[in-house]
Amino acid sequence: MQYVTDLSKYQTENRTAVTLGKFDGLHRGHQELISRIQRFADQEKAESVVFAFDMGKEALMTGEEKKAYLEGCVDTLIICPFTEAIREMEAEEFIEKILIEQLHAAYIAVGTDFHFGHQKRGDICMLKQYAKRYGYELEIVEKAVYRKREISSTYIREALKVGNVELAEKLLGYRYRTEGV
């Protein structure tokens, strides 16, 4: 697996199947997005790419932990620091410059609440509008649910905060572990 922490150094000539988001904790909802890009990549001989925005210290998982978890599952993991340049980039520019010109996206899988670009102006409606123009297939994946509540990193953090590791593991879909001194 290629592990990229500097987006300017990533290059591919291959068509890609991309999923984008924070991917904090790599919970069951994230796992479904990843399975969708894997399926497309296998069927269409494309490169599978997880594009994760690095949100800093508040994250459940570091980039290195994501790398260890995804090793052997996807072709490329991009950890994109949430810099001012990324934060200020207009949504249309993100689609054109990042998804199309740099990633060569042929397929994009995102959750129903995915937003991107300056002031979160980009959303699934915008991705749908641009799909035909740029020739990518878009799949919107419904949120995973547990006990009638959407699985999210916030839900996992809440469970861990009150010591409910068992619930956190059900939401994650794997055993939770932490390292420290």
Language-model segments: residues:
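Nucleotidyltransferase catalytic core that binds NTPs
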Residues: M1-V181
